[in-house]
Amino acid sequence: MMKATPIALLLAGVLASPLCAAGLDARLTLVEGSTDDVRVNLTLTNTGEKPVRLLKWQLPGSEDAPLFQVERDGQPVDYEGALIKRAAPSDKDYQLLKAGQSLTVQAEVSGLYDMSAQGQYSIRYLLPTVAQEGKAAKAKQAQASESNAVTLWVDGVSDDRVLAKAAVAEPQAVSASVSFSGRCTNTQKSDILAALDAASGIANNSSSYLAVDKPNGQRYRSWFGAYDATRWNQAETNFSKIKDAIDNKPLTFDCGCKQSYFAYVYPDQPYKVYLCKSFWTAPVTGTDSRAGTIVHELSHFNVVAGTDDLGYGQANARNLASTDPQKALNNADNHEYFAENTPSEN
């Protein structure tokens, strides 16, 4: 497995901008200092004598849309964002750009296009034509046009697990691969892969611990309660499946969640994990870590351990272990804290 490397912006060439129709000039520049993720500034200027109406969803912003032409080494790069069905535009869907007025917006391109592979990239903004419906408007609608192209070298996220997803034709045959959705940036992809490596480490450690019965093991007692052979075997099975999911299954991580919690999954939809705000601020390892979050979420899948959320936090998890060990075996946080093992216990 190759280590994920940051993007190196070694070249930011700006080519000549084509003349834009309807008096609209589109200028694209790279954002300085974006060393891990590719961000661009788009400046639109109405060079005509009349106002121009721009469809808001044709401007880079919070909503996904295939607004850029991205190529790597001369070959088109896949758009990975959402494709949205919309109603016909109404007045509220337009933004007015007066004569002589400019508008600058920023876009994070590597979150919407597959820029994980190393190579020479070019990026160009495209403003498609949308037919005007209804009566003629006082302001002209912007017609099809494009910006200049910016070019840059990208080191990419070089990881065998990411590349594996493109090498397999049959979905059921995919193994040990990682894919991304929800506008994951290259920084986020690298962070996820680092967390996944750490999750693999603590899952392996947990499986090794459970491979030999330890009736007096304090680590087990803290998180799964008093020793019982049947429950011990169940814990061993659960972690064997968690380890297998990390090592051998096609994992998908979605970065689109804006909620304050750590992550969530749909138990009957393996192996997709939705990562939220608290995940990104958590440490890689330790209590309530990124690695532990991955273990927690994978345990929820019905094909893994089918755990529930019966109590959150170490205090509640310890209480479950001491008062109802069977429920502790069904609680995702108990699996997470057993795997994280902080503070360390034997």
Curated annotation (Swiss-Prot):
Give a short account of what the protein does.
Answer: Heat-labile protease.
The UniProt entry, under PANTHER family, shows: NEUTRAL PROTEASE 2-RELATED (PTHR37016:SF3), PTHR37016
Enzyme's top EC category: hydrolase
Q: Where is the signal peptide?
A: 1-21
Keywords from the UniProt entry: Hydrolase, Metal-binding, Metalloprotease, Protease, Signal, Zinc
Annotated protein name in UniProt = Extracellular protease
Its cofactor is: Zn(2+)
Q: How is the cofactor bound?
A: Binds 1 zinc ion per subunit.
GO terms for MF: metal ion binding; metalloendopeptidase activity
Question: Might you give the EC number(s) for this enzyme?
Answer: 3.4.24.-
Which SMART domains does UniProt cross-reference here? Aspzincin_M35
The entry's family comment says:
Belongs to the peptidase M35 family.
> Which domain of life does this protein belong to?
Bacteria
Identify the catalytic residues. 297
| UniProt-annotated binding residues for Zn(2+) | 296, 300, 309
Q: Which GO terms describe its biological process?
A: proteolysis
Q: Which SUPFAM superfamilies match?
A: Metalloproteases ('zincins'), catalytic domain
Pfam families for this protein: Aspzincin_M35 (PF14521)
For the keyword Zinc, the answer is: yes
